[in-house]
């Protein structure tokens, strides 16, 4: 591609609303442009990178026997209703009506469409296993689009769905996908970690996320300082503390606690650690059930775990009126003792370690001392409802946990029969008996992968693309005018490189050399050849790798083979990670 013909409007400065490096550099390097909040257009260089990423994904999906399809972007309410997702997605779903007043939505993912596609075509156990996938546009009405293409309203995603008649078969495909994902991200030049994860609104049994460690990541990852335990904070467990071994026989004692609003205030007032308190939080489920959740005072409730304990129901903090109705007090003084209404009490396992606890008094400006489980109140549902945090103990080895920020690139699930049951998908097994197939679901964010490549590969000059996903592999820069022999030699090198399969750009623009070199650094092409009459007088051209910034002089007659060798070395460097 000649730059004189390429639509590449690079910018000296990023727009003021671009915050993170990948967003700034995508805009400056003319990969993309912001159209409106959460919506981006991709320019030619950006399209080439997206295509490279998609092709890597496609090759690895095909290698494990997956079949590429394309589902409609539009999905009907009728299709989303059996799975419950028409209601579950709520405001995230872009909804519309067609001219016949039929409710439709822009697809957020396509579990339902793939399920009925398989259901309509498969009748026998002999047709399993089957894996279908697409690389397609998705839509979600994000409440706060941010970080450029990392969280946007429209995005490209690879979503795959596998169908099985045995758990063992699903496990094999799940493991094959996990291996393929690891290979995909390594081929992109990305360093990722896989972590245990929650299945979220997708439902299912097993779940694993592939993360890029990044300070701009929206996910918190919990790591063990000794063993290989790691998990998304939504899923992370901790080693339970020992249960309290002794309790006093002190009677309950009400204490007037005016102007006390926080756990820190309570610590100072009672001159004791927050670990000696039991917090009580009132929640309301989507089915309008009111529950109380008790947890040790130094911990926070993990609402994902709580939702899972409730069968995946959406939950929210109860409003002030509801809290008053249930407890008789304003927010901040709830307690499992003496509730005004009969509700279920959930308790995190952490409160087992608390003896003679301090709890709210279900009365304004009041707390109760000397509280002990069973003697003073009973629990309906015990469980792990705490948010793991730095300093907790590993559930596997007991050593200290620490945390880092991460950005989710891929997510794989064992869905089980969630969708096949919803659509009454049945097939005949080898004994001619009806069975319900089970499914797996596997997603990769293509746009996020592009942004992550940049987040991990840039310097103060611009992007440093790994050769596997670079828009072009090499760029030839002509220093002199078109009338000069050096320009013709640069053009000859450009044509020859393209003819032997090196994807090459030619900067033939009538621009100052400084502008050309700055653009080279900014757009991150791995290999650069600079051709000028002064160097040609010595029989050489300048060769430079973007990553190392080291330049060497190479004889004109050797430059083609030299570029071929360096290109192979760059690919070998990536392949050595596989």
Swiss-Prot record:
Keywords: Aminoacyl-tRNA synthetase, ATP-binding, Cytoplasm, Ligase, Nucleotide-binding, Protein biosynthesis. Its EC number is 6.1.1.15. It comes from the Bacteria. It catalyses: tRNA(Pro) + L-proline + ATP = L-prolyl-tRNA(Pro) + AMP + diphosphate. GO terms for cellular component: cytosol. InterPro entries: aa-tRNA-synt_IIb, aa-tRNA-synth_II, aa-tRNA-synth_II/BPL/LPL, Anticodon-bd, Anticodon-bd_dom_sf, Pro-tRNA-ligase_IIa, Pro-tRNA-synth_IIa_bac-type, Pro-tRNA-Synthase_IIa_type1. It holds the Pfam family HGTP_anticodon. It is found in: Cytoplasm. Its main location: cytoplasm. One of its GO terms (molecular function) is aminoacyl-tRNA deacylase activity. GO terms for biological process: prolyl-tRNA aminoacylation. Catalyzes the attachment of proline to tRNA(Pro) in a two-step reaction: proline is first activated by ATP to form Pro-AMP and then transferred to the acceptor end of tRNA(Pro). As ProRS can inadvertently accommodate and process non-cognate amino acids such as alanine and cysteine, to avoid such errors it has two additional distinct editing activities against alanine. One activity is designated as 'pretransfer' editing and involves the tRNA(Pro)-independent hydrolysis of activated Ala-AMP. HAMAP family: Pro_tRNA_synth_type1 (MF_01569). Homodimer. Consists of three domains: the N-terminal catalytic domain, the editing domain and the C-terminal anticodon-binding domain. Belongs to the class-II aminoacyl-tRNA synthetase family. ProS type 1 subfamily. This is Proline--tRNA ligase. It comes from Brachyspira hyodysenteriae (strain ATCC 49526 / WA1).
């Amino acid at each position: 591609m000649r730059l004189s013909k390429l639509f590449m409007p690079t910018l000296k400065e990023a727009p003021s609303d671009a915050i993170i490096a990948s967003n700034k550099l995508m805009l400056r390097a003319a990969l993309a442009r912001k159209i409106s909040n959460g919506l981006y257009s991709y320019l030619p260089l950006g399209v080439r990178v997206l295509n490279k990423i998609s092709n890597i994904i496609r090759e690895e999906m095909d290698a494990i026997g997956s079949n590429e399809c394309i589902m409609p972007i539009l999905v009907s309410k009728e299709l989303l209703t059996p799975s419950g997702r028409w209601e579950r997605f709520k405001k995230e779903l872009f909804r519309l009506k067609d001219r016949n007043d039929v409710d439709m939505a822009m697809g957020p993912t396509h579990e339902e469409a793939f399920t009925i596609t398989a259901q309509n075509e498969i009748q026998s156990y002999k047709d399993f296993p089957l894996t279908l996938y697409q690389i397609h546009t998705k839509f979600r009405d994000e409440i706060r689009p941010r970080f450029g293409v990392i969280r946007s309203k429209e995005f490209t995603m690879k979503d795959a769905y596998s169908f099985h008649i045995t758990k063992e078969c699903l496990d094999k495909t799940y493991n094959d996908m996990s291996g393929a994902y690891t290979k995909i991200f390594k081929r992109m030049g990305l360093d990722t970690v896989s972590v245990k994860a929650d299945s979220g609104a997708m439902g299912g049994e097993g779940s694993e996320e592939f993360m890029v460690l990044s300070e701009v990541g929206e996910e918190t990852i919990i790591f063990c300082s000794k063993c290989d335990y790691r998990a998304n904070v939504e899923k992370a467990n901790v080693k339970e503390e020992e249960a309290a071994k002794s309790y006093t026989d002190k009677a309950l004692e009400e204490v007037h606690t005016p102007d006390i609003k926080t756990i820190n205030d309570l610590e100072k007032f009672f001159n004791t650690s927050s670990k000696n308190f039991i917090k009580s939080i009132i929640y309301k489920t989507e089915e309008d059930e009111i529950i109380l959740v008790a947890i040790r005072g130094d911990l926070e409730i993990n609402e994902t775990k709580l939702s899972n304990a409730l069968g995946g129901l959406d939950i929210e903090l109860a409003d002030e009126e509801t809290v008053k109705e249930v407890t008789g007090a304003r927010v901040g003084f709830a307690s499992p003792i003496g509730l005004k209404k009969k509700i279920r009490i959930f308790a995190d396992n952490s409160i087992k370690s608390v003896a003679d606890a301090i709890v709210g008094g279900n009365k304004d400006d009041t707390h109760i001392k000397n509280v002990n489980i069973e003697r003073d109140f009973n629990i309906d549902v015990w469980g792990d409802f705490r948010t793991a945090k730095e300093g907790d103990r590993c559930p596997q080895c007991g050593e200290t946990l620490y945390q880092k920020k991460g950005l989710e690139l891929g997510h794989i699930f064992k869905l089980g029969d969630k969708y096949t049951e919803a659509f009454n998908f049945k097939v005949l097994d080898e004994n001619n008996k009806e069975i319900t197939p089970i499914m797996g679901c596997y997603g990769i964010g293509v746009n996020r992968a592009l942004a992550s490549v940049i987040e991990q590969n840039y310097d103060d000059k611009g992007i440093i693309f790994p050769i596997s996903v670079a828009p072009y592999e090499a760029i030839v820069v002509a220093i002199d005018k078109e009338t000069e022999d050096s320009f013709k030699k640069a053009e000859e090198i450009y044509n020859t490189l393209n003819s032997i399969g090196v994807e090459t750009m030619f900067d033939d623009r009538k621009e100052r050399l400084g502008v050309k070199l700055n653009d080279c650094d900014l757009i991150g092409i791995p290999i650069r050849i600079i051709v000028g009459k002064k160097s040609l007088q010595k029989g050489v051209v300048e060769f430079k790798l973007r990553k190392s910034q080291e330049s060497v002089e190479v004889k004109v007659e050797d430059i083609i083979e030299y570029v071929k060798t360096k290109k192979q070395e760059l690919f070998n460097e990536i392949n050595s990670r596989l």
